[in-house]
């Protein structure tokens, strides 16, 4: 089985490829499309799916915690800018608000384990 990494930033996507090649994160495929373009069919056959993958911190952390690469899991760290003070708090009107797309994929694919995170801002 293999992992799916979704990351639109070209620099971060290349880092993912480098880390995969070096064996530091689960082997897999890096998809640079927007999550809004990803369908449930695109995810068939992947054991792990990492959305907003950045430089593979979820895959790395799971390995460090003893989570095997062949154990199914979905992870994601949605962009915080739509709701953060630094991001001007445009909320649901912000084009970076991608939770609905990820939530839809979770609903349709129904993975057994999903980990997500969102950091709190310094102002709460």
What are these regions (language model features)?
Residues 1-124:
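Conserved active-site and SAM-binding loop architecture
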């Amino acid at each position: 089985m293999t992992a799916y990494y979704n990351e639109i930033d070209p620099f971060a996507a290349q880092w993912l490829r480098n880390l995969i090649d070096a064996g530091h994160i689960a082997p897999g495929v890096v998809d640079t499309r927007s999550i809004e373009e990803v369908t449930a069919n695109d995810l068939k056959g992947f054991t792990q799916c990492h959305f907003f993958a950045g430089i593979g911190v979820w895959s790395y952390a799971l390995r460090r915690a003893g989570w095997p690469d062949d154990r199914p899991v979905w992870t994601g760290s949605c962009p915080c800018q739509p709701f953060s003070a630094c991001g001007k708090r445009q909320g649901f009107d912000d084009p970076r608000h991608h939770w609905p797309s990820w939530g839809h994929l979770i609903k349709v694919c129904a993975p057994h384990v999903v980990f997500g995170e969102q950091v709190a801002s310094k102002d709460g």
